[in-house]
């Protein structure tokens, strides 16, 4: 056979018993979840920043970054709510390359997914304990949800997973916001249908059980750019793209109309230095159009300690080993700039025509 079963993996409950969340951290998560929920329902008008490394490759570097981020998050909290990105599993276009801490707790060693499950849970818990900020992660594998359902405050479903039925149905059973990215083709209808599936109740097989869900009213869209037939990046963060999404929402029976704009990936053409400009243009569009302001709840930014990226084993602390990221100094400046840009009557500061 081409597939071999290597080792039994513990259930979510078994791993939670090994690495439990204290009552103090449970209370932090409950408070954070409520704050974030209110932004997606429109009760809280703050702007969301989902920000952090492309991939969480090293616990110490990631937690160092999160501690820096927490200090700035405190300074901007009146206008901006920060959700750290701690992405522990990575989709790979060709199947090659570093697939995240779940696969390789140590990027320089062989894959060990059991140790990876331990590692991602320990890192998420450490980050909450040190910073008081619960995080976002990508749901690359739908069955992984059972291992992190008590520690995450936001989940993204990627461009290659968004059409998958198991991802959609699993999202319908979550009680936190789930962002559905547009597929690599850029088709809004696929993304909207994913949101529709996520907001409806379902019965399906999950992790050896027949499961029933109630539907997730916080399922929403993420615009991340697209690829044309020649493999070139097409952005979809401009004003006309946001208007098109607003109009698309009117045609679907969805609640809590919301969008997050991913400032990297095909929106930037993976030119990480473009992210601050893209974020500011999105805020400009929000300030210009009340409909867009109501729709666009925030942005997603890839950021780490050092600018750019490096190969696995490159040896530079806090530098991405997957997609290039914005360095810390530029990240801090962006957040503080956006504190001004999201304030009342501040649009003239942005300088975007």
Label every model-predicted segment.
Residues 6-40:
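N- or domain-start disorder-to-order transition segments that initiate the globular core
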Residues 29, 35, 56-57, 62, ...:
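Metallocofactor- and cofactor-centric catalytic cores in central/energy metabolism, strongly enriched
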Residues 41, 127-130, 253:
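Acidic (Asp/Glu)-rich catalytic clusters
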Residues 52, 261, 327:
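Conserved, mostly hydrophobic/aromatic
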Residues 66, 79-244, 265-270, 274-281, ...:
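Active-site-facing alpha/beta catalytic cores
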Residues 304-339:
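Internal helix-turn-beta structural module
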Residues 341-346:
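Conserved small/polar residues in nucleotide/adenosyl-binding loops
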């Amino acid at each position: 056979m081409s597939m071999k079963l290597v080792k039994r993996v513990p259930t979510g409950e078994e791993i939670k018993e090994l690495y439990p969340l204290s009552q103090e951290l449970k209370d932090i998560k409950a408070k954070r979840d409520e704050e974030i929920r209110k932004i997606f329902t429109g009760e809280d008008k703050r702007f969301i920043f989902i920000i952090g490394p492309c991939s969480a490759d090293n616990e110490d570097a990631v937690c160092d970054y999160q501690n820096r981020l927490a200090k700035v998050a405190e300074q901007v909290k009146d206008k901006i709510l920060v959700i750290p990105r701690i992405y522990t599993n990575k989709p790979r276009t060709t199947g090659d390359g570093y697939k995240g801490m779940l696969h390789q707790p140590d990027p320089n060693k062989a894959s060990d997914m059991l140790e990876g499950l331990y590692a991602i849970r320990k890192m998420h818990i450490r980050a909450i304990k040190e910073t008081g900020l619960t995080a976002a992660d990508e749901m690359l594998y739908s069955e992984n949800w059972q291992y992190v359902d008590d520690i995450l405050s936001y989940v993204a479903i990627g461009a290659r997973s968004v059409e998958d039925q198991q991802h959609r149905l699993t999202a319908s059973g979550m009680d936190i916001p789930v962002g559905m990215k547009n597929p690599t083709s850029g088709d809004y209808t696929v993304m909207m249908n994913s949101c529709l599936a996520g907001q409806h109740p379902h019965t399906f097989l999950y992790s050896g059980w027949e499961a029933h869900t109630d539907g997730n009213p916080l399922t929403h869209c993420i615009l991340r750019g697209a690829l044309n037939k020649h493999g070139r990046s097409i952005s979809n963060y401009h004003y006309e793209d946001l208007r098109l999404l607003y109009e698309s929402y009117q045609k679907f029976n969805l609640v809590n109309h919301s969008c997050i704009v991913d400032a990297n990936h095909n929106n930037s053409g993976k030119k990480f230095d473009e992210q601050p400009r893209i974020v500011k243009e999105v805020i400009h569009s929000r300030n210009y159009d009340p409909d867009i302001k109501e729709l666009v709840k925030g942005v997603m930014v890839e950021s780490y300690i050092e600018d750019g990226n490096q190969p696995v084993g490159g040896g530079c602390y806090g530098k991405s080993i997957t997609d290039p990221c914005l360095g810390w100094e530029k990240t801090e400046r962006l957040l503080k700039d956006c504190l001004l840009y999201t304030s009342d009557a501040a649009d003239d500061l942005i300088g975007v025509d």
